[in-house]
Amino acid sequence: MQENAYFCTVIHYYITKRKDVTAPEYKQLKAFARVDGALLAVLMIACFACYIAGLTSPLYGFLSIVAIVMMPFFAGIRLKRFRDTGLEGSISFMRGWAYICLMFFYGGLIFALAQYAYMAYMDKGYLVMTITNILALPENAEVIKQLGMADQVSESIHMLQAMRPIDFALNMLTTIIMGGIMLGLPIAAIMRRTRPLS
């Protein structure tokens, strides 16, 4: 919760310092971002489920990649909806960027909880075992040996085996937040509009 408060405070500081958003507008921005973050989390959970299934089925692996590619477009569509319905068609770059950052933050929190629940109670070592088996296949082992990466791969597998479910979840949360910060820049620039809808 302290991390949540800190992240929201940083976003609030940057957008209110520029006099871009009043307190009620910031409250509205966070409310819309929470809802859209929950929807984004559903997409992330579906992507993760397809990834797990995709370890043994190429079709699900492909669907996982499609879901990852869809996330920035989904975020852009939801920002456009917020701009057109909540702000009457006008949004600044900074407000759009803050919206995307918060949406990925809230979505990342929900997804991290879901991933923690999966890794702690359902996985039972399946993920690491499947990755180990894939890397141990003769054709993959030969490529790893030719590249001189046998020690690095072995060390990486040991690190994966030593990771706790909370470590997986926190790593993913950090990745999602950083991804949201970076993806928010082009999305906010594209969706920026200074003229309200007529």
Go through the PLM ranges and name each one.
Residues 155-178:
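Individual transmembrane alpha-helix segments
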Residues 39, 43-47, 71, 107-115, ...:
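Alpha-helical transmembrane segments of multipass membrane proteins
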Residues 77-95:
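Membrane-helix interface/capping segments
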Residues 22-26, 191-198:
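Short, charged juxtamembrane terminal tails flanking transmembrane helices
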Residues 5-83:
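Transmembrane alpha-helical insertion/packing segments
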Residues 122-162:
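Membrane-interface interhelical loops and short interface/amphipathic helices
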Residues 31-35, 39, 95-107:
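Alpha-helical transmembrane segments of multi-pass membrane proteins
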Residues 101-125:
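C-terminal halves and exits of single transmembrane alpha-helices
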